């Protein structure tokens, strides 16, 4: 985990677990829900405080995207849910570009022509 501090604020970032936030506190008081030790140990991003929803948020019905006359089948990440949810950014490790005491930059590049193309048909880059 990457620990960042600024005055009374502390943020714990987990780039290897979907770019998720493990903790965000002010003077030791959680501002986001706490991430359990089990979620950190297992890498279960859904148990973290927050995680990025890229390249889309919420759900795409029946895990099928219709765009510009084409149809794209998307993965279903949650058992029992027939829809695609939250894109693939939360399923991927993010690359750490820079870390300082009070800031970090993490990056995710999705190349739609490579091995993970089935997850999203279009290239994108997300940075936080």
What spans do the regions from the language model cover?
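Surface-exposed acidic/polar loop and edge beta-strand patches at domain peripheries
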Residues: 1-127
